[in-house]
Amino acid sequence: MTNSNRIKLTWISFLSYALTGALVIVTGMVMGNIADYFNLPVSSMSNTFTFLNAGILISIFLNAWLMEIVPLKTQLRFGFLLMVLAVAGLMFSHSLALFSAAMFILGVVSGITMSIGTFLVTQMYEGRQRGSRLLFTDSFFSMAGMIFPMIAAFLLARSIEWYWVYACIGLVYVAIFILTFGCEFPALGKHAPKTDAPVEKEKWGIGVLFLSVAALCYILGQLGFISWVPEYAKGLGMSLNDAGTLVSNFWMSYMVGMWAFSFILRFFDLQRILTVLAGLAAILMYVFNTGTPAHMAWSILALGFFSSAIYTTIITLGSQQTKVPSPKLVNFVLTCGTIGTMLTFVVTGPIVEHSGPQAALLTANGLYAVVFVMCFLLGFVSRHRQHNTLTSH
Protein backbone atom coordinates (compact mmCIF):
# COMPACT_ATOMS: atom_id res chain seq x y z
CA MET A 1 0.00 0.00 0.00
CA THR A 2 1.43 3.38 -1.01
CA ASN A 3 1.86 6.10 1.59
CA SER A 4 -0.53 8.52 -0.17
CA ASN A 5 -3.19 5.78 -0.32
CA ARG A 6 -2.75 5.08 3.41
CA ILE A 7 -3.10 8.83 4.17
CA LYS A 8 -6.34 9.02 2.13
CA LEU A 9 -7.81 5.97 3.89
CA THR A 10 -6.79 7.39 7.29
CA TRP A 11 -8.55 10.69 6.49
CA ILE A 12 -11.67 8.78 5.43
CA SER A 13 -11.56 7.12 8.88
CA PHE A 14 -11.16 10.50 10.63
CA LEU A 15 -14.07 12.04 8.71
CA SER A 16 -16.31 8.99 9.25
CA TYR A 17 -16.11 9.56 13.01
CA ALA A 18 -16.60 13.32 12.57
CA LEU A 19 -19.79 12.64 10.56
CA THR A 20 -21.32 10.42 13.27
CA GLY A 21 -20.24 12.80 16.05
CA ALA A 22 -21.82 15.77 14.27
CA LEU A 23 -25.12 13.95 13.66
CA VAL A 24 -25.45 12.57 17.20
CA ILE A 25 -24.29 15.58 19.25
CA VAL A 26 -26.01 18.34 17.21
CA THR A 27 -29.44 16.82 18.03
CA GLY A 28 -29.84 18.74 21.30
CA MET A 29 -29.10 22.04 19.57
CA VAL A 30 -31.73 21.76 16.82
CA MET A 31 -34.47 19.77 18.57
CA GLY A 32 -36.40 22.83 19.80
CA ASN A 33 -36.35 24.48 16.36
CA ILE A 34 -37.50 21.27 14.66
CA ALA A 35 -40.32 20.90 17.22
CA ASP A 36 -41.48 24.47 16.38
CA TYR A 37 -41.20 23.69 12.65
CA PHE A 38 -43.59 20.73 13.03
CA ASN A 39 -45.69 22.41 15.78
CA LEU A 40 -44.98 19.59 18.23
CA PRO A 41 -43.85 19.53 21.88
CA VAL A 42 -40.11 18.88 22.31
CA SER A 43 -40.76 15.67 24.30
CA SER A 44 -42.56 13.96 21.40
CA MET A 45 -40.01 15.35 18.92
CA SER A 46 -37.13 13.70 20.77
CA ASN A 47 -38.66 10.27 20.06
CA THR A 48 -38.22 10.76 16.30
CA PHE A 49 -34.45 11.02 16.81
CA THR A 50 -34.57 7.36 17.86
CA PHE A 51 -34.73 6.70 14.09
CA LEU A 52 -31.22 8.19 13.79
CA ASN A 53 -29.84 5.88 16.52
CA ALA A 54 -31.75 2.90 15.09
CA GLY A 55 -30.23 3.54 11.65
CA ILE A 56 -26.72 3.69 13.15
CA LEU A 57 -27.26 0.47 15.15
CA ILE A 58 -28.78 -1.56 12.28
CA SER A 59 -26.15 -0.48 9.74
CA ILE A 60 -23.17 -1.21 12.04
CA PHE A 61 -24.62 -4.65 12.78
CA LEU A 62 -25.39 -5.52 9.13
CA ASN A 63 -22.16 -4.08 7.75
CA ALA A 64 -20.16 -6.87 9.38
CA TRP A 65 -21.58 -9.06 6.57
CA LEU A 66 -22.09 -6.37 3.90
CA MET A 67 -18.36 -5.52 3.92
CA GLU A 68 -17.60 -8.99 2.51
CA ILE A 69 -20.26 -8.69 -0.23
CA VAL A 70 -20.22 -5.03 -1.33
CA PRO A 71 -16.77 -3.37 -1.87
CA LEU A 72 -16.00 -0.59 0.63
CA LYS A 73 -15.57 2.08 -2.07
CA THR A 74 -19.00 1.21 -3.55
CA GLN A 75 -20.59 1.48 -0.10
CA LEU A 76 -19.12 4.95 0.49
CA ARG A 77 -20.18 6.23 -2.94
CA PHE A 78 -23.70 4.86 -2.54
CA GLY A 79 -23.72 6.47 0.93
CA PHE A 80 -23.07 9.84 -0.73
CA LEU A 81 -26.20 9.40 -2.86
CA LEU A 82 -28.25 8.49 0.24
CA MET A 83 -26.82 11.50 2.10
CA VAL A 84 -27.93 13.88 -0.68
CA LEU A 85 -31.42 12.29 -0.69
CA ALA A 86 -31.74 12.53 3.12
CA VAL A 87 -30.66 16.20 3.31
CA ALA A 88 -32.96 17.05 0.36
CA GLY A 89 -35.77 15.24 2.20
CA LEU A 90 -35.17 17.38 5.31
CA MET A 91 -35.12 20.58 3.25
CA PHE A 92 -38.17 20.09 1.06
CA SER A 93 -40.60 18.01 3.13
CA HIS A 94 -42.99 19.23 5.80
CA SER A 95 -44.05 15.70 6.75
CA LEU A 96 -43.02 14.13 10.06
CA ALA A 97 -42.97 10.67 8.43
CA LEU A 98 -40.48 11.89 5.79
CA PHE A 99 -38.42 13.62 8.50
CA SER A 100 -38.22 10.31 10.44
CA ALA A 101 -37.28 8.43 7.24
CA ALA A 102 -34.55 11.00 6.45
CA MET A 103 -33.20 10.66 10.02
CA PHE A 104 -33.12 6.86 9.65
CA ILE A 105 -31.22 7.18 6.33
CA LEU A 106 -28.72 9.59 7.95
CA GLY A 107 -28.24 7.01 10.72
CA VAL A 108 -27.69 4.19 8.20
CA VAL A 109 -25.15 6.26 6.22
CA SER A 110 -23.21 7.32 9.32
CA GLY A 111 -23.23 3.78 10.80
CA ILE A 112 -21.90 2.23 7.57
CA THR A 113 -19.26 4.95 7.21
CA MET A 114 -18.14 4.69 10.84
CA SER A 115 -17.85 0.88 10.72
CA ILE A 116 -15.77 1.18 7.51
CA GLY A 117 -13.61 3.86 9.18
CA THR A 118 -13.00 1.65 12.23
CA PHE A 119 -12.16 -1.37 10.07
CA LEU A 120 -9.70 0.63 7.90
CA VAL A 121 -7.71 1.70 10.98
CA THR A 122 -7.64 -1.85 12.42
CA GLN A 123 -6.56 -3.17 8.99
CA MET A 124 -3.79 -0.61 8.30
CA TYR A 125 -2.08 -0.45 11.70
CA GLU A 126 -0.68 -3.14 14.00
CA GLY A 127 -0.23 -3.61 17.74
CA ARG A 128 0.03 -0.54 19.96
CA GLN A 129 0.12 1.80 16.96
CA ARG A 130 -3.39 0.58 16.13
CA GLY A 131 -4.63 1.69 19.55
CA SER A 132 -3.15 5.18 19.29
CA ARG A 133 -4.43 5.63 15.70
CA LEU A 134 -7.92 4.48 16.64
CA LEU A 135 -7.91 6.86 19.59
CA PHE A 136 -6.86 9.79 17.41
CA THR A 137 -9.60 8.81 14.93
CA ASP A 138 -12.18 8.77 17.72
CA SER A 139 -11.11 12.28 18.76
CA PHE A 140 -12.72 13.52 15.52
CA PHE A 141 -16.09 12.42 16.97
CA SER A 142 -15.57 14.79 19.92
CA MET A 143 -14.08 17.52 17.71
CA ALA A 144 -17.17 17.47 15.47
CA GLY A 145 -19.24 17.43 18.66
CA MET A 146 -17.63 20.74 19.61
CA ILE A 147 -17.55 22.41 16.16
CA PHE A 148 -21.02 21.60 14.79
CA PRO A 149 -23.04 22.81 17.82
CA MET A 150 -21.17 26.13 17.38
CA ILE A 151 -22.12 26.18 13.67
CA ALA A 152 -25.72 25.32 14.62
CA ALA A 153 -25.81 28.13 17.21
CA PHE A 154 -24.39 30.59 14.64
CA LEU A 155 -27.00 29.65 12.00
CA LEU A 156 -30.00 29.47 14.36
CA ALA A 157 -29.10 32.83 15.98
CA ARG A 158 -29.41 34.40 12.51
CA SER A 159 -32.87 32.84 11.97
CA ILE A 160 -31.50 30.48 9.30
CA GLU A 161 -33.63 27.32 9.05
CA TRP A 162 -32.45 24.30 11.08
CA TYR A 163 -32.05 22.03 8.02
CA TRP A 164 -29.03 24.07 6.86
CA VAL A 165 -27.20 22.58 9.89
CA TYR A 166 -27.63 19.14 8.28
CA ALA A 167 -26.51 20.55 4.91
CA CYS A 168 -23.28 21.67 6.65
CA ILE A 169 -22.85 18.18 8.15
CA GLY A 170 -23.34 16.82 4.61
CA LEU A 171 -20.16 18.66 3.57
CA VAL A 172 -18.18 16.18 5.71
CA TYR A 173 -19.53 13.40 3.47
CA VAL A 174 -18.65 15.42 0.34
CA ALA A 175 -15.02 15.31 1.56
CA ILE A 176 -15.25 11.51 2.11
CA PHE A 177 -16.74 11.10 -1.40
CA ILE A 178 -13.90 13.13 -2.99
CA LEU A 179 -11.27 11.07 -1.11
CA THR A 180 -12.64 7.79 -2.57
CA PHE A 181 -11.36 8.81 -6.04
CA GLY A 182 -7.93 7.43 -6.88
CA CYS A 183 -7.91 5.47 -3.63
CA GLU A 184 -7.50 1.68 -3.27
CA PHE A 185 -9.46 -0.02 -0.47
CA PRO A 186 -8.66 -3.39 1.18
CA ALA A 187 -10.66 -6.16 -0.53
CA LEU A 188 -12.70 -8.49 1.66
CA GLY A 189 -14.69 -11.72 1.28
CA LYS A 190 -15.27 -12.81 -2.33
CA HIS A 191 -13.40 -9.71 -3.59
CA ALA A 192 -10.22 -10.57 -1.63
CA PRO A 193 -7.24 -11.93 -3.61
CA LYS A 194 -7.35 -15.75 -3.71
CA THR A 195 -4.62 -17.65 -1.88
CA ASP A 196 -3.80 -21.35 -2.05
CA ALA A 197 -3.62 -21.64 1.73
CA PRO A 198 -6.97 -22.49 3.34
CA VAL A 199 -8.39 -19.63 5.41
CA GLU A 200 -8.26 -20.63 9.05
CA LYS A 201 -11.36 -19.60 10.97
CA GLU A 202 -10.38 -18.30 14.38
CA LYS A 203 -12.54 -18.63 17.45
CA TRP A 204 -13.17 -15.30 19.16
CA GLY A 205 -12.73 -16.47 22.74
CA ILE A 206 -14.33 -15.33 26.01
CA GLY A 207 -12.27 -12.11 25.98
CA VAL A 208 -14.58 -10.74 23.26
CA LEU A 209 -17.58 -11.32 25.57
CA PHE A 210 -15.89 -9.34 28.38
CA LEU A 211 -15.02 -6.52 25.95
CA SER A 212 -18.55 -6.42 24.49
CA VAL A 213 -20.14 -6.14 27.94
CA ALA A 214 -17.56 -3.45 28.80
CA ALA A 215 -18.40 -1.50 25.59
CA LEU A 216 -22.15 -1.60 26.28
CA CYS A 217 -21.80 -0.64 29.96
CA TYR A 218 -19.28 2.11 29.20
CA ILE A 219 -21.38 3.92 26.57
CA LEU A 220 -24.60 3.45 28.57
CA GLY A 221 -22.82 4.73 31.69
CA GLN A 222 -21.18 7.67 29.92
CA LEU A 223 -24.32 8.91 28.13
CA GLY A 224 -26.53 8.17 31.15
CA PHE A 225 -24.16 10.29 33.23
CA ILE A 226 -23.66 13.24 30.87
CA SER A 227 -27.37 13.42 29.91
CA TRP A 228 -28.46 14.04 33.52
CA VAL A 229 -25.55 16.17 34.79
CA PRO A 230 -27.35 19.46 33.90
CA GLU A 231 -30.53 18.44 35.79
CA TYR A 232 -28.51 17.24 38.78
CA ALA A 233 -26.44 20.46 38.85
CA LYS A 234 -29.59 22.63 38.62
CA GLY A 235 -31.03 20.68 41.55
CA LEU A 236 -27.97 21.74 43.58
CA GLY A 237 -28.73 25.40 42.84
CA MET A 238 -26.39 25.94 39.89
CA SER A 239 -27.55 28.14 36.98
CA LEU A 240 -28.42 26.57 33.61
CA ASN A 241 -25.36 28.27 32.13
CA ASP A 242 -23.02 26.78 34.77
CA ALA A 243 -24.64 23.36 34.33
CA GLY A 244 -24.06 23.58 30.56
CA THR A 245 -20.43 24.58 31.17
CA LEU A 246 -19.90 21.34 33.12
CA VAL A 247 -20.94 19.32 30.05
CA SER A 248 -18.77 21.45 27.70
CA ASN A 249 -15.79 21.02 30.03
CA PHE A 250 -16.30 17.25 30.04
CA TRP A 251 -16.15 17.02 26.22
CA MET A 252 -13.24 19.46 25.95
CA SER A 253 -11.24 17.47 28.50
CA TYR A 254 -12.30 14.23 26.75
CA MET A 255 -10.88 15.48 23.45
CA VAL A 256 -7.60 16.66 25.02
CA GLY A 257 -7.36 13.26 26.75
CA MET A 258 -7.76 11.45 23.43
CA TRP A 259 -4.89 13.40 21.90
CA ALA A 260 -2.69 12.82 24.95
CA PHE A 261 -3.44 9.08 25.18
CA SER A 262 -2.92 8.56 21.43
CA PHE A 263 0.75 9.22 22.32
CA ILE A 264 0.84 7.68 25.85
CA LEU A 265 -0.77 4.32 24.92
CA ARG A 266 2.21 3.30 22.76
CA PHE A 267 4.30 2.74 25.91
CA PHE A 268 1.90 0.52 27.88
CA ASP A 269 0.22 -2.86 27.67
CA LEU A 270 -3.33 -2.01 26.52
CA GLN A 271 -5.21 -4.35 28.88
CA ARG A 272 -3.33 -3.11 31.96
CA ILE A 273 -3.73 0.61 31.22
CA LEU A 274 -7.40 0.02 30.31
CA THR A 275 -8.02 -1.56 33.73
CA VAL A 276 -6.28 1.36 35.49
CA LEU A 277 -8.26 3.97 33.49
CA ALA A 278 -11.59 2.17 34.07
CA GLY A 279 -10.90 2.05 37.82
CA LEU A 280 -9.87 5.73 37.90
CA ALA A 281 -12.98 6.74 35.91
CA ALA A 282 -15.28 4.89 38.34
CA ILE A 283 -13.61 6.62 41.33
CA LEU A 284 -13.71 10.10 39.71
CA MET A 285 -17.39 9.69 38.81
CA TYR A 286 -18.11 8.74 42.44
CA VAL A 287 -16.22 11.87 43.60
CA PHE A 288 -18.38 14.00 41.24
CA ASN A 289 -21.64 12.32 42.30
CA THR A 290 -21.02 12.74 46.03
CA GLY A 291 -18.97 15.97 46.02
CA THR A 292 -19.92 19.60 46.57
CA PRO A 293 -20.67 22.02 43.69
CA ALA A 294 -17.34 23.75 44.41
CA HIS A 295 -15.38 20.61 43.38
CA MET A 296 -17.61 19.55 40.47
CA ALA A 297 -15.73 21.46 37.76
CA TRP A 298 -12.40 19.81 38.64
CA SER A 299 -13.78 16.29 39.05
CA ILE A 300 -15.64 16.39 35.70
CA LEU A 301 -12.49 17.69 33.93
CA ALA A 302 -10.47 14.82 35.43
CA LEU A 303 -13.22 12.32 34.56
CA GLY A 304 -13.32 13.50 30.93
CA PHE A 305 -9.53 13.25 30.59
CA PHE A 306 -9.02 9.81 32.17
CA SER A 307 -12.08 8.16 30.62
CA SER A 308 -11.33 9.38 27.07
CA ALA A 309 -9.21 6.37 26.06
CA ILE A 310 -11.49 3.64 27.44
CA TYR A 311 -13.88 3.00 24.54
CA THR A 312 -11.32 2.99 21.72
CA THR A 313 -8.97 0.80 23.75
CA ILE A 314 -11.85 -1.68 24.19
CA ILE A 315 -12.33 -1.74 20.38
CA THR A 316 -8.56 -2.04 19.78
CA LEU A 317 -8.24 -4.98 22.19
CA GLY A 318 -11.26 -6.56 20.50
CA SER A 319 -9.51 -6.36 17.12
CA GLN A 320 -6.40 -7.98 18.69
CA GLN A 321 -8.23 -11.08 19.98
CA THR A 322 -7.69 -12.72 16.56
CA LYS A 323 -4.46 -12.93 14.53
CA VAL A 324 -6.10 -11.23 11.52
CA PRO A 325 -8.44 -8.29 12.36
CA SER A 326 -12.01 -9.52 11.80
CA PRO A 327 -14.59 -6.97 10.57
CA LYS A 328 -17.35 -9.10 12.16
CA LEU A 329 -15.61 -9.00 15.55
CA VAL A 330 -14.87 -5.25 15.42
CA ASN A 331 -18.46 -4.54 14.34
CA PHE A 332 -19.83 -6.79 17.09
CA VAL A 333 -18.04 -4.76 19.79
CA LEU A 334 -19.13 -1.51 18.07
CA THR A 335 -22.74 -2.79 17.94
CA CYS A 336 -22.69 -3.48 21.69
CA GLY A 337 -21.53 0.11 22.27
CA THR A 338 -24.31 1.42 20.02
CA ILE A 339 -26.89 -0.66 21.94
CA GLY A 340 -25.67 1.29 25.00
CA THR A 341 -26.54 4.53 23.14
CA MET A 342 -30.02 3.23 22.30
CA LEU A 343 -30.70 2.19 25.90
CA THR A 344 -29.62 5.51 27.48
CA PHE A 345 -33.06 7.01 28.09
CA VAL A 346 -34.84 3.63 28.27
CA VAL A 347 -32.76 2.81 31.36
CA THR A 348 -32.21 6.24 32.94
CA GLY A 349 -35.64 7.81 32.21
CA PRO A 350 -37.62 5.63 34.68
CA ILE A 351 -34.81 5.91 37.29
CA VAL A 352 -34.96 9.73 37.18
CA GLU A 353 -38.77 9.64 37.30
CA HIS A 354 -38.79 7.52 40.47
CA SER A 355 -35.63 8.59 42.30
CA GLY A 356 -34.26 11.78 40.71
CA PRO A 357 -31.16 12.66 38.63
CA GLN A 358 -28.60 11.62 41.28
CA ALA A 359 -29.92 8.03 41.12
CA ALA A 360 -29.22 8.02 37.36
CA LEU A 361 -25.67 9.29 38.00
CA LEU A 362 -25.09 6.58 40.62
CA THR A 363 -26.43 3.95 38.18
CA ALA A 364 -23.91 5.23 35.62
CA ASN A 365 -21.24 4.90 38.32
CA GLY A 366 -22.25 1.27 38.87
CA LEU A 367 -21.94 0.64 35.12
CA TYR A 368 -18.40 2.10 35.15
CA ALA A 369 -17.59 -0.32 38.01
CA VAL A 370 -18.80 -3.20 35.78
CA VAL A 371 -16.44 -1.93 33.03
CA PHE A 372 -13.54 -2.09 35.53
CA VAL A 373 -14.44 -5.69 36.53
CA MET A 374 -14.67 -6.77 32.85
CA CYS A 375 -11.28 -5.18 32.04
CA PHE A 376 -9.71 -6.87 35.09
CA LEU A 377 -11.12 -10.29 34.11
CA LEU A 378 -9.90 -9.75 30.54
CA GLY A 379 -6.34 -9.82 31.86
CA PHE A 380 -6.65 -13.58 32.49
CA VAL A 381 -7.95 -14.52 29.01
CA SER A 382 -6.86 -11.81 26.51
CA ARG A 383 -4.96 -12.99 23.42
CA HIS A 384 -3.61 -9.56 22.40
CA ARG A 385 -0.14 -10.22 23.87
CA GLN A 386 0.51 -13.40 21.86
CA HIS A 387 -0.81 -11.79 18.64
CA ASN A 388 1.32 -8.68 19.19
CA THR A 389 4.38 -10.90 19.69
CA LEU A 390 3.63 -12.69 16.41
CA THR A 391 3.25 -9.44 14.43
CA SER A 392 6.45 -7.94 15.86
CA HIS A 393 8.65 -10.84 14.53
UniProtKB/Swiss-Prot annotation:
Organism of derivation: Escherichia coli (strain K12)
Membrane topology: Multi-pass membrane protein
Lineage, broadest ranks: Bacteria, Pseudomonadati, Pseudomonadota, Gammaproteobacteria, Enterobacterales
Annotated protein name in UniProt: Protein TsgA
Protein's cellular compartments: Cell inner membrane
NCBIfam families the record matches: PRK03699.1 (NF002982)
Keyword Cell inner membrane part of the UniProt annotation: yes
Periplasmic compartment segments: 32-50, 99-100, 155-161, 227-244, 294-296, 353-360
UniProt similarity note: Belongs to the major facilitator superfamily. TsgA family.
GO molecular function: transmembrane transporter activity
An example Gene Ontology CC term for this record: plasma membrane
GO biological process terms held by the UniProt record: response to selenite ion
Chief location category: membrane
Expression induction: By selenite or tellurite. Maximal expression was detected at concentrations of 10.0 and 0.5 micrograms/ml for sodium selenite and sodium tellurite, respectively.
Record Pfam families: MFS_1
